[in-house]
Amino acid sequence: MKVVSSYGVEIKKQNIPIRHTLYIYRQAVGYLIRVYEESWEELSRIVNLQKRFNAAEHLVHSTKKNRARYDFDQKFPKMPSYLRRSAIQHALGSVSSYETRLELWKQKKLDGKPKLVYENHAMPVFYRDVMYKEAEDQTDRAFLKLYDGHDWKWFSVNLLHTDMEYLRENWSGVKASAPTLEKRHHKYFLRFSYTEEVSLSKKEVNEQIICSVDLGINTDAVCTIMRSDGTVLGRKFINFPSEKDQMYRVVGRIRRFQREHGSGQVQSRWNYARRLNMELSRKVASAITTYAQNNHVDVIVFEYLEMKGKAAGKKKQKLRLWRKRDIQKLCEQQAHRTGMRVSRVCAWNTSRLAYDGTGEVIR
């Protein structure tokens, strides 16, 4: 099984033209989306995706043997070839998705007419050797080819030391994909993806050891290590009270601010609360998988928690802040990296009925 993991390395603040590069790349993608929307009837006849991509590139890029139909090369001169192909791929995907959704809408299989967005939020990929180079002396630096407003030049960028230490410690020897530029919280990152080939546990059901996880609101998780015959080998209560207390205090301050000033200026405060909540999810997921790994578990079992509709009652805000799905997704990613499987069971009657099917549990 292939497991893909990614990690974002922060680019330290310095005088490099990242915003110029991002602007020109998004302008190129927007231009290409308009071109391929006009030419989609011609491109859609080409079934083979590679041939369709080649035909799309020939429409906008001139060579010795090809004369482009559109003036892309004049509008975006000297754009690196790999960056141009990345923009073409993004534009083709956007137009193809729009046309597919439009057909579904015409067949009344989709509610609401889809809209093709030209003002996109595409992020460039820095392909190795032509757009991105690592520093040879193993320092916290890299070289990126960026647009300075006049030409494409190589710039040295400093990367955050702690992020680079993490990559050297945990991902040394694993081949990384070309980094993608990312912007989060007014900061820029280079996101690296790593692909690993892992083999999951193949033990027979009767020989498996499972970790049953009961996610909760007051107590973050209760982990029980069990054999197939019901023998309990261990139990652990996972709770992060200080982190939850910090988050609830932030939510309380937001509530008081909204009561006095309205809800027009609280977006940044809610973003901070969400980041605290997501960090809590990461800690809970890491604690679950670490405990399961220490007990040589084959399968981590969760309840399938599906909560639809409007929550009611005094605890409705706590229910909405409960990131049960994020915890399960993070656990699944971490468990697969270590060879453990993840399973989900229906939550109905899991406390009422006995594990072996003998009936209701008398308490």
Task: Label each region the model flagged.
Residues M1-R363:
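Nucleic-acid substrate recognition interfaces
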